């Protein structure tokens, strides 16, 4: 990274800062690297004063922790409102798959929050076509994943062994312990995810499902103006999509089923 970055940018000072942060103790380094991304924008534009700069930070909220998510977005907002001298505008786009982080940020009104569903069927088919054969037919791949590209890649890596992927999800999400505690409620959520939206359902279960990234809760209206790209259907029982709650992917629902069995 150091070699390529120096050759491409000739900004050795910035490389030194990133390398120094990365060499520190884990945890401290993650936070410092995430905040350095903001500093990097200011530094680059003050040095170059030309062209455009893009800084991409992946999984920032996982690295810095939910409690710092709002502060991080506020720092990005400061860049937007007060761009470095010589720059006309700054655009900040922050994406997260963590359900709780959206609520943490949204309560401060520092960002315009828009949901993005899995890939549209047309876009997903383009991705599917690039995967080499042998493979199941497209409709089967769509039925299993609901357009989730990560689930598609897991199926491909598992040589389309659905049971292997499901068992991996059960282990990774710790679903057997959750089923022991919430079996009766989970049976209803597997039957229809909107059951989770009922008042008599335990909040603790809802929070667990969100924290384990198994569901999307309190879905936006399906009008295109509320969504980035194509919104999901109003309801689709086969894909596990309800009006207010949806499984992240049909395979997430299958994993909960598998844990119950």
Residue locations for each model-derived region?
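Conserved Walker B catalytic segment
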Residues: 30-108
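Short loop/turn segments at strand-loop or loop-helix junctions that form parts
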Residues: 2-5, 55-61, 220
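C-terminal leucine-rich, beta-strand-based interaction scaffolds used for sensing/assembly
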Residues: 6, 172-261
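Conserved AAA+ ATPase "sensor/coupling" helix adjacent to the nucleotide-binding pocket
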Residues: 110, 126-133, 158
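Amphipathic alpha-helical "lid/sensor" segments that cap RecA-like P-loop NTPase cores
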Residues: 133-185, 203-211, 219
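A short helix-turn-beta junction within AAA+ P-loop NTPase domains corresponding to the substrate/partner-engaging
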Residues: 2-3, 104-122
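Non-catalytic recognition/regulatory regions in large multidomain proteins
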Residues: 62-65, 85, 130-138, 143
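Conserved NTP-binding/hydrolysis module of P-loop NTPases
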Residues: 1-31
